[in-house]
Amino acid sequence: MPAKLSVNLNAIAMLRNRRDLPWPDVAHFGQIALSAGASGLTVHPRPDQRHIRFSDLPVLRALIDDRFPGAEFNIEGYPTEDFLVLCEKTQPEQVTLVPDDPSQATSDHGWDFRKHAVFLKDVVGRLKAGGMRVSLFADGDGEREPVELAAETGAARIELYTGPYGGCFDDTQKADLLVEKLGQTADHAAALGLAVNAGHDLTVANLPKLMKRIPNLAEVSIGHGLTADAMEYGMAETVRRFCQACGQRNS
């Protein structure tokens, strides 16, 4: 089964924010991505708004509602009160909770579910009551207990942190080891009734191996590698390439 592609727009927003100018237009690139076959858009609004701005959210929400009603909006972030209120106002189809410190450059680890289980259960319950699906950022280390604890929060999905796998480059032996651990984690999730997303440093080159090991992968969220390719091939063609790497047939 093909995985859905959600295009992360943070890198586009970061480029825009280098100047006090309205371009590149985040919503315009979101429109191109969805028109080219992406199933959704992802943003990670940080407290300092260093890339995605809070004002981007209603614009992207309206884009999906008005032009692409079958697409999904995914908002990532650490669940502060301000973040939760932002989600409640925006009503994304999915909220992906990550354990980031506000100063982190990017998400680089999953939740410690042993430590944060009670906290996450409360947050998940609040978001679900608001009609949002919740995914929890998780390390793909192959252990079962953390996945069991994630399932007990009431979340519908986990998102596998694929950074170490994405960073292997040409080290095939290491990549094989890491993708097997990711696969074991996904197997535990499936057995516990959790759907599985994945994200971080995924590329057209490394997606097929991941898809082969996790054929039930529901969604991948990709920003940096996709944006880098878009600088060479254009956004629309790049999205089509990533959709194909996800196992989708280009229309």
UniProtKB/Swiss-Prot annotation:
Q: What class of enzyme is it?
A: transferase
Signal sequence, renumbered to the chain:
none
Catalytic positions?
44 (proton acceptor), 76 (proton acceptor), 200 (proton donor)
Going by the UniProt record, its keywords in alphabetical order are: Cytoplasm, Pyridoxine biosynthesis, Transferase
The molecular function GO annotations come to:
pyridoxine 5'-phosphate synthase activity
User: Quick one: which residues bind 1-deoxy-D-xylulose 5-phosphate?
Assistant: 46, 51, 106
List locations, semicolon-separated.
Answer: Cytoplasm
Question: Belongs to which family?
Answer: Belongs to the PNP synthase family.
Name recorded for this polypeptide: Pyridoxine 5'-phosphate synthase
What organism is listed for this UniProt entry? Agrobacterium fabrum (strain C58 / ATCC 33970) (Agrobacterium tumefaciens (strain C58))
Top-level taxonomy:
Bacteria, Pseudomonadati, Pseudomonadota, Alphaproteobacteria, Hyphomicrobiales
